[in-house]
Curated annotation (Swiss-Prot):
Catalytic activity: [PQQ precursor protein] + S-adenosyl-L-methionine = E-Y cross-linked-[PQQ precursor protein] + 5'-deoxyadenosine + L-methionine + H(+)
UniProt remark on cofactor binding: Binds 1 [4Fe-4S] cluster. The cluster is coordinated with 3 cysteines and an exchangeable S-adenosyl-L-methionine.
Entry EC number(s): 1.21.98.4
Superkingdom of origin: Bacteria
SUPFAM superfamilies assigned: Radical SAM enzymes
Protein's recorded name: PqqA peptide cyclase
CDD domains on file: Radical_SAM, SPASM_PqqE
Organism (species): Methylobacterium sp. (strain 4-46)
GO biological process per UniProt: pyrroloquinoline quinone biosynthetic process
Subunit note: Interacts with PqqD. The interaction is necessary for activity of PqqE.
């Protein structure tokens, strides 16, 4: 079978990481270990230009993220730019700090949707996971105002060892807060989550139980609450298509303007990431070496190259392949066809069986923690 690079589709989504500043310190944060400082952030005019270029390129959805996007003083102007350009805007927020104070203005500026993170259903556990006291009352007040304004609300709950027993309570909480959608997203182990893997890894029986709870709730709450489920890679049979396939559907613009094919792409050595301060977004999408590196199937090795699923999962996660197999072009070890798959599952079982989970290494703007990186499973 001949490997091909498919005709370049237009990107659908843009993840606009407006800032890495955030009042929460979640140990599973997908931001890089080396966080951009405020002084490096793009200014308002640059973000407005980037959004205009995104609309011209064919982008439909803009996810205003961070860090905490409402930490930006110009978040209302940026949201208004999305509305003026006909871009559907989704605010991905912690709901704490100054988020509530800006919510009415964001709604008036044309905000379309809110995604609110919830660390746990129980307040004390939520504070322990997020590293911030009194976060839960702020989140609940924020959610109440979102619903009062008539904005659709999605709750996002990242699931791990520390909160997996709360999945039923999280579902009840989503209903109580008036959310239209709940994302039960098991931790993806890159960024800070990779550092904290041993502290976060749940046991397989607990994962299976959480899946059954979600499936039952989907039937019970049909028409009231949509529940999305993201299963943990380390226990999966096949990998997910990272970001819909490398360089196929999504772009991620960092606070300092680098354009990435996915959150964790900077962990892959040798990739050159072009910056919106130097090049147009369309040029980056079409010609950036980083986007071309793993776009399509021509880069694939066996068994991916001849696999019937190669244009479904697009080889899985390149960053995970690097972290676990030591080769970004290797088969994602989350795939059952990888020669390392059994080792990955054994690693997950071993870490989840630790009698006492390690302490969290909390996300910090000051730089990467000085702790040993987890080992991969390369042969």
């Amino acid at each position: 079978m001949t490997a091909v690079t498919p005709t370049l589709p237009a990107p659908i989504g843009l993840l606009a990481e407006l800032t890495h500043r955030c009042p929460l310190r979640c140990p599973y944060c997908s931001n890089p270990l080396e966080l951009d400082k405020r002084s490096a952030e793009l200014d308002t005019a640059t973000w407005q230009r980037v959004l205009g270029e995104a609309a011209a390129l064919g982008v439909l959805h803009v996810h205003l993220s961070g860090g905490e996007p409402t930490a930006r003083q110009d978040i209302v102007e940026i949201t208004g730019a999305c509305a003026d350009l006909g871009l559907y805007s989704n605010l991905i927020t912690s709901g704490v700090g100054g988020a509530l104070a800006k919510l009415d203005a964001l709604s008036e500026a044309g905000l379309d949707h809110v995604q609110l993170s919830i660390q746990a259903a129980e307040a004390g556990n939520a504070e322990r996971i997020g590293g911030l006291r009194n976060a839960q009352p702020q989140k609940f007040a924020f959610a109440e105002r979102v619903v009062a304004l008539g904005l659709p609300l999605t709750l996002n709950a990242v699931i791990h060892r520390g909160n997996i027993d709360e999945v039923p309570a999280l579902i009840d909480l989503a209903v109580r807060l008036g959310a239209k959608r709940l994302e039960v997203a098991h931790t993806q182990y890159y960024g800070w989550a990779y550092v904290n893997r041993a502290a976060l890894m749940p046991a397989k029986p607990d994962v299976d139980r959480s899946i059954r709870v979600v499936e039952e709730a989907r039937e019970r709450l049909k028409g009231r609450l949509v529940i999305d489920l993201v299963v943990p890679d380390y226990y999966a049979k096949y990998p997910k298509a990272c970001a819909g396939g490398w360089g196929r559907r999504l772009m991620n613009v960092t606070p300092s303007g680098k354009v990435l094919p996915c959150h964790a792409a900077e962990t892959i050595p040798g990739l050159a990431f072009w910056n919106v301060q130097e090049r147009a977004l369309g040029d980056i999408w079409a010609n950036s070496p980083a986007f071309q590196a793993y776009r399509g199937t021509s880069w694939m090795k066996e068994p991916c190259r001849s696999c019937d699923r190669r244009e479904k999962d697009w080889g899985g996660c390149r960053c995970q392949a690097l972290a676990l197999a030591g080769d970004a072009a290797a088969t994602d070890p989350a795939c059952s066809l990888s020669p390392l798959h059994a080792k990955v599952q054994a690693l997950a079982v071993a870490e989840s069986a630790l009698e006492t989970a390690p302490d969290y290494q909390y996300r910090t703007i000051g730089g990467a923690p000085v702790v040993p990186q987890p080992e991969g499973v390369s042969a």
